[in-house]
Each structure stands twice: as structure tokens, then as C-alpha cells.
Amino acid sequence: MKKSKRTDRKGSIHIQSTFNNTLITVSDAQGACVCWSSAGLVGFKGAKKGTPFAAGMAAEKVAQLAKDQGMKQVDVFVKGPGAGRETAIRALEAAGLQITSIQDVTGIPHNGCRPPKRRRV
């Protein structure tokens, strides 16, 4: 069954960037998921999923899918400490989507879970 083209010109893009992967989700004005992509879905495996280049490739793919659905303007919400945050936003802009706002929605713990131990390199 072929997906029907939506007429929503405005939507929101959520970028969740972790140290191991970058997930990008596009939703319409009502909040329903239109399409999504990740560094793993684009073809990267293992440690390469956490790189900025992989995040850029995932953002290019999701931007193309969103444009095929008729989306023009997007609000961007970024969550997480990963390396692909800025690269994904730049790739969305370069793909032709008009970004109206960028908002950081990273959760800040009020002394919740104990963080992982410090790395010794």
C-alpha cells in the first residue's frame, strides 16, 4: 500500500543524539510520526554510528522523506550529548528544509541516577 502524501507544510523534527547513535524523527503538527531515520538505518554499524558524518547522512535521508511528504518548515528539538547534534541540523538546512526554531530539550537530572564511571584513556 502506497503512503498518501500529506498536505502539512509545517512539522517538527526530534534529534536524539547519544554517544552511540543518532535518531531523527519527523512528526506533523498533531504529533503523529511521519518518518524516521537513524545512523544504523542508513548503513553504519558499530562505533561508526556515533560519528557526526553518520548523523549527517541520517538527517539527509529524513529530510528527503519529509520533503516527499510535502513538508517545508520545521521546528527542531535536540536531545542528548552526542557528536551528531550540530551536523544533523546543518544537513537538514542544506537539504532544503526551512528551520523556524531550534530548541534543546536535553533532560537535566535533579540528582537522579548515578552517572557512568570516568573514562581512563
Curated annotation (Swiss-Prot):
It is found in: Plastid, Chloroplast. Keywords: Chloroplast, Plastid, Ribonucleoprotein, Ribosomal protein, RNA-binding, rRNA-binding. Pfam families: Ribosomal_S11. One of its GO terms (molecular function) is rRNA binding. GO terms for cellular component: chloroplast; ribonucleoprotein complex; ribosome. Transmembrane segments: none annotated. It comes from the Eukaryota. Its main location: plastid. The keyword rRNA processing does not apply. The keyword tRNA-binding does not apply. GO terms for biological process: translation. Part of the 30S ribosomal subunit. Belongs to the universal ribosomal protein uS11 family. This is Small ribosomal subunit protein uS11c. It comes from Cyanidioschyzon merolae (strain NIES-3377 / 10D). The lineage of its organism: Eukaryota, Rhodophyta, Bangiophyceae, Cyanidiales, Cyanidiaceae.
